[in-house]
Amino acid sequence: MEQTWRWYGPNDPVSLSDVRQAGATGVVNALHHIPNGQVWPVEEILARKAIIEAAGLTWSVVESVPIHEDIKTQTGDYLKYIENYKQTLRNLAQCGIHTVCYNFMPVLDWTRTDLEYVMPDGSKALRFDQIEFAAFELHILKRPGAEADYTAEEVEQANARFAAMTDAEKARLTRNIIAGLPGAEEGYTIEQFRARLADYDGIDKAKLREHFAFFLKNIIPVAEQVGLRMAVHPDDPPRPILGLPRIVSTIEDMQWMVETVDSIANGFTMCTGSYGVRGDNDLVAMIKRFGNRIYFTHLRSTCREENPKTFHEAAHLGGDVDMYNVVKAILEEEYRRKQEGHPLLIPMRPDHGHQMLDDLKKKTNPGYSAIGRLKGLAEVRGVELALKRAFFE
């Protein structure tokens, strides 16, 4: 696997020097300062690439080229935004960058309720609490019909949880959900959030799939023409939330994608921490079935709690993800490609990490502190080395 590291650009508290010392050789980056829907100019791409290469690293993966909400709802200037997206892909390929991670999640990117969940060892993790999320939906957002998405017991627990919250806790919960986590391209006020959700009235899973298919049928031929690999990121969490459909959550969704646009350019990001939240997702089976379409991996683990829809981010080798067999399956795919004359490694980044040690005293991007990811990368690297020695050499 190619060892990579997500870097948020010149304002990231983790420097490129830190990245190189962590042992990564590739950088996962995006031009976050360019508004959604606008073309990424060649000169901007080359300028960022030069910064990365000056540090002795390679810009391996773009994460992400965000998809404008108009494309997802097929409203407004969606056709113009699709043309802009095509041009950005051409520009990236012209600059020698050939792997793009993206997602098709409506309104929100990845979602958590607690950004400072204290683990038994004192480190801090990210957490999604189903009951707190219900409290937000029912009492802060006041989404019509939200009760139908929860069990009677969950509604009762959410009512009690909200009643016990201080104003500061309510504000923090709201901010965690709608203000935009690292990598999310948009944050909202509560009024803007309600309006954005309303844009999806009448858009169910079938309709969102229709819009996604339209996007893919326009984008993938361009990607194929310029030699670029598109790697869709799964929904996080991988289930409908806020009354919004989710369409990249299961192995069935992956199968639908490859059948809808059967092109080698139409591929996946295997994010074990996202897919792995669902107990019915067999990660190893996913990798084995769609290995030839996996162009990027995010390796992390989560741990489902008593309510299986509540989870926290575990240590990279702990939790519910069988990291040993996941890495083994990825290496088997790399070996298969090598045997067929395609020796390029699959980029892997240690996804998220606990805030620990000195990072507990620093301002960090939630999930993206340095030391937790350093630990995760070292652990995964060790698993990879042991597997290679045992099975591939």
Swiss-Prot record:
- Which pathway is this protein engaged in? Carbohydrate metabolism; pentose and glucuronate interconversion
Task: Give the cofactors, semicolon-separated.
Answer: Fe(2+); Mn(2+)
Purpose: Catalyzes the dehydration of D-mannonate.
Q: Which organism is it from?
A: Tolumonas auensis (strain DSM 9187 / NBRC 110442 / TA 4)
Domain of life of the native organism: Bacteria
| GO process annotations (BP) | D-glucuronate catabolic process
Q: Mind telling me what this protein is named? A: Mannonate dehydratase
Entry EC number(s):
4.2.1.8
In the UniProt record, the gene name given for this protein reads uxuA
InterPro entries per the UniProt record, alphabetical: Man_deHydtase, Xyl_isomerase-like_sf
Q: Which reaction does it catalyse?
A: D-mannonate = 2-dehydro-3-deoxy-D-gluconate + H2O
Q: Member of which family?
A: Belongs to the mannonate dehydratase family.
Q: Name one GO molecular function term.
A: mannonate dehydratase activity
List UniProt keywords, sorted A-Z: Iron, Lyase, Manganese
